[in-house]
From Swiss-Prot:
EC number(s) from the headed UniProt entry: 6.1.1.22
Catalytic activity, as annotated: tRNA(Asn) + L-asparagine + ATP = L-asparaginyl-tRNA(Asn) + AMP + diphosphate + H(+)
Protein location: Cytoplasm
Name listed for the protein in its UniProt record: Asparagine--tRNA ligase
GO molecular function terms noted in the UniProt entry: asparagine-tRNA ligase activity; ATP binding; nucleic acid binding
The encoding gene: asnS
Similarity remark: Belongs to the class-II aminoacyl-tRNA synthetase family.
Phylogenetic classification of the source organism: Bacteria, Bacillati, Cyanobacteriota, Cyanophyceae, Synechococcales
Pfam families in UniProt: tRNA-synt_2 (PF00152), tRNA_anti-codon (PF01336)
InterPro entries cross-referenced by the UniProt entry: Aa-tRNA-synt_II, aa-tRNA-synth_II, aa-tRNA-synth_II/BPL/LPL, Asn-tRNA-ligase, Asp/Asn-tRNA-synth_IIb, NA-bd_OB-fold, NA-bd_OB_tRNA
CDD domains from the UniProt entry: AsxRS_core, EcAsnRS_like_N
Biological process terms in GO annotation: asparaginyl-tRNA aminoacylation
Keywords from the named record: Aminoacyl-tRNA synthetase, ATP-binding, Cytoplasm, Ligase, Nucleotide-binding, Protein biosynthesis
Oligomeric form and interacting partners: Homodimer.
Native organism: Synechocystis sp. (strain ATCC 27184 / PCC 6803 / Kazusa)
Amino acid sequence: MNKRRIIEVLRHGQADDQVMVQGWLRTKRTLKDFSFVEVNDGSSLANLQVVLDGSLADYDRLLSQLQTGAALVVEGKLAPSPGKGQRVELKATKLELLGGADPGSYPLQKKRHSFEFLRTIGHLRPRTNTIGAVMRVRNACATAIHQFFQERGFLWVHTPIITASDCEGAGDLFKVTTLDLQRVPKNGEGIDYSQDFFGKQAYLTVSGQLEAEVMALAFQNVYTFGPTFRAENSNTSRHLAEFWMVEPEMAFCDLEGDRQWAEEFLKYIFKFVLEKCPEDMEFFDQRIDNTVLATADNIINNEFAWLTYSEAIKLLEKADQKFEYPVAWGVDLQSEHERYLAETVFKRPTIVTDYPKDIKAFYMRLNDDGKTVAAMDILAPKIGEIIGGSQREERLDILTQRMQEQGVPEEDLWWYLDLRRYGSVPHAGFGLGFERIVQFMTGMANIRDVIPFPRTPMNAEF
């Protein structure tokens, strides 16, 4: 028997094909001499309609056990479907119940469940239409990311999850230790980390950028794609404690090249997902956010807007809209400012460059004016910042000065400074929050619903 995924059957199956499908029952409808059941195997949004004839072996017993959530194996012959919505249906010649589901306790019944409720049953929510569609789009996004960089000769590098440095300087780090918390060793300065596993204080990484720079200065173009962590006590729809980051790093590249790479990258991802997940994207447009497809089209077919931070401040100061946070040169843009620029002023993704040096990280290249750095943020409608990047400071003396200004210990990053001593070149990179792009693409309101197992304050279930 030809084992097939349901998406293959629905797209390519022909009448009289003998097939076997495996999946989970979504709905059952019983008539006098036969029944209809809808089966889903996770490969597509659509279910496959299976026709069970009353003459099927053990029909009555099987029918009584076929409840929503039950796992099935069905064999039979495809036939043209007289109903609307799909070309073929499966007329069963054999049905096997692999695992039942008690209708009295199975929480996913044929009704609409809130996303808040679904988060409490994270082990079952992938079986719902919406979360299933999110995960297929997430998979397509990840595939697109790798394909984009691999087609362009980038090397995928694996940077450490455990680190001794705070790349971003934010301070919201998860500490890693094997010390006995009941008997913590002390010295004159406090905890004696020399007795810890690594002989020094260690953390979960917030970024693989610094290590990616190491690799870029050997292999030219590289990218990282992996989990990052931030112990920021934020219970909002935009924050996760564990999230995935994509961080390309390009040697012999300046801010203009960085901007071009980032724009091409975003357009590629959206185009790829629209081609690979058309039914899922249509679902999001109809059920979640009716601007999803228009937003994708806007990104793919329009040049991104581009202006400096100073120009952005002038536009915001002249805005008719009242902002919660004041606008002033030297103050970082808030989400409301970013969204105003992308949604109201330019109505498309917007790239803001050349931020004040005092609000950006030490590794960003100082511009000739001595006040700004060669940084960029890409702002997306409804989301705000979706990509942050910069040309890196390749000049040893200026990098050292910037570290001193920001209180970054040189001894902790001696190896990073060495990169500027031996064969230093202009280089640049950017970071994309993976969940942010999935959220932006699907229109999902809460970032906790675009990752399989969200990690947030007071929540590490499943």
